[in-house]
């Protein structure tokens, strides 16, 4: 059971939207097993903290459109999953949540492309929101994720890393994403969209 269910949110609705977002192009996969393996990684899920933050923040607003806010939560989760697929490649991980990683099952190249595919699905969902400021913030979050990973790689085994540099890396890789998850609902134009 994910945190979504524990906090009283409609986990089944979330999962249905998540599945629909990714499997809409399932006929494009020449290898049905590959699509099933990708879906297993996505649906096996973790705690779903980022989507939970989207939904919790939405509760601060009255008359929120359920489909729109859950779509934003799914888009956030897909962006996170894409980053995990890529992280598994960088870290040479063989499993995640007791499931063999995609690059381990197929190849590094396939793993990268599957991560990119999931990221694209996230961006497709975000594109439904016609809010330029939101799109700019998505670009900032993605930039921060990339810079944080590059900084981490650059400082690998750097035992003289300053506390400020560590905090900056953590902000880039983690906190900026959490922050975005919390305040995605607070764009004035998004309020109008979700009302």
Regions found by a protein language model. Give the residues of each.
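Primarily interfacial, aromatic-capped hydrophobic alpha-helices that serve as membrane anchors
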Residues: 117-133
